[in-house]
Amino acid sequence: MNQLLTAEALRLLDEVGEIDSKADVLSIITKLRKAGHPALLVTEVITQARLRTRAKAKFGDFASSMLFTEAGLEQATRLQVAAVHAERLKLGGYKKIADLGCGIGADSLAFASLGLEVTAVEQDPQTAALASFNLAPFPNAEVQVSDAEQFDLTSFDAV
């Protein structure tokens, strides 16, 4: 995952698009390696493209602009469910939300898209980096690398 957040990797990931079969994987690996891209970069791009393809079931078209880990995708709240949670918080008058153990930021995306101020907290730095990428379009969302049990919640309306 070290090279995934580079401009080159993100460009290649967009070029690769969806991967639907093992034949696609082989074809894309061959093409990228012939173009001179390092094996590690190609592996990370292929892995991410496959995760994006699988993520469409949870995130619809949003998956094509997100980054995932295997565990993060498996544990992420489905977009429709996160949207219901976010709507309930908004209707309840809550404005400042702490999303503890945010993972890749699925719930935080829903909160932020409704205009709620979100601080997403994730202990794992690599997962937090992906959450930051996924939340980048929202100026009302931030990600902090921290232990959720130690995080100060005094300034938040809801957790």
Can you annotate each of these PLM segments?
Residues 1-159:
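SAM-dependent transferase fold signal centered on methyltransferase-like domains
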